[in-house]
Amino acid sequence: MSFRIAVLISGEGSNLQALIDGLGDAPVEIVGVGSSRADSRGLERAEAAGLETAVFSLADEPDRDKRDGALADWLDQRDVELVVLAGFMELLTPGFIRRFAGRIVNIHPALLPSFAGLRAVAQTLEYGVKVAGVTVHFVDEGMDSGPIILQEAFGLPYHRGIEAMGEGEIDAIEERFHEVEHRLLPRAVRLIAAGRVSIDPDDSRQVRVESDG
C-alpha cells in the first residue's frame, strides 16, 4: 500500500519535479499538489504528471485561518499521511500545523538554524560563510525552527559581496543549492515513508534517522 503525500508549492516547482522524478519505484503516491498561487509554474509540472491540483490563494480568501482550514480539509479528504512543503512561500497558521503535527516537512536552502526565513541563499552569500547547505526539517509553529531530519553541506568558493557579484556567479551558486535540494528532499520522503524517521519521545529536538544504505 502506498504512502500518501501531498506537496505544497508557490512558484517554479522544481522541488516538486524532483519528487516526481526521484521517488521512482518507492511505495509513495503524490495524491495532490496545492499551490498558494494560481500562476505557479509548478501547477503545470503537476498537471503534466497527471497529478490532482488545487489553488489556495490569499487573494481569493484573505482570511488566513479560513484559507488554511480549507487546505487542511482538502488534505484530509485525500487521506494524506505527509505534507511536503516544496517551495511553499507562506507561513501556515498554528491551527493547521497542530492539525498535522509531526506530519509536515519543509526543505530550506541553508544549514539551519543559520539563515532561517526568506532570502536564505542571499543571507548565506552576504554573511560570507565558507560552508553552505540544505536542511529538511519537520515544521512547527516557528520560522524554520522544527526538528531537523537531514542536512547536506557543501563548500562555497570565494566570492565578492552579493551586491558586487555578477548574475552568472549567483546563478551558479543557486544551482548548487538546487542540486542538493533535488537529491535531499526525495531521500527524506523515502525514509519517512519507510518508517525510518522518528522524533525522540524524550527530546523533541532530536530526530532518529535509520540508514537508507
Report residues per predicted region.
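Glycine-rich phosphate-binding loop signature in dinucleotide/nucleotide-binding domains
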Residues: W74-E81
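Glycine-rich, highly charged phosphate/nucleotide-binding loops
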Residues: A59-A72
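Residue-level detector of anion-binding/catalytic polar loops
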Residues: E52, E81, K130
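Donor/substrate-binding cores of folate-linked one-carbon enzymes
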Residues: G22, V28, S36, A86-R208
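A generic structural signal for well-ordered alpha-helical segments
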Residues: A46-E47, L75, I97, T124
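A residue-level signal for conserved active-site and pocket-lining positions in enzyme catalytic cores
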Residues: G11, V33, A46, V83, ...
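Short beta->alpha connector loops at strand-helix junctions that form conserved
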Residues: A54-A59, I107
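N-terminal Rossmann-like dinucleotide-binding module
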Residues: M1-R41, R45
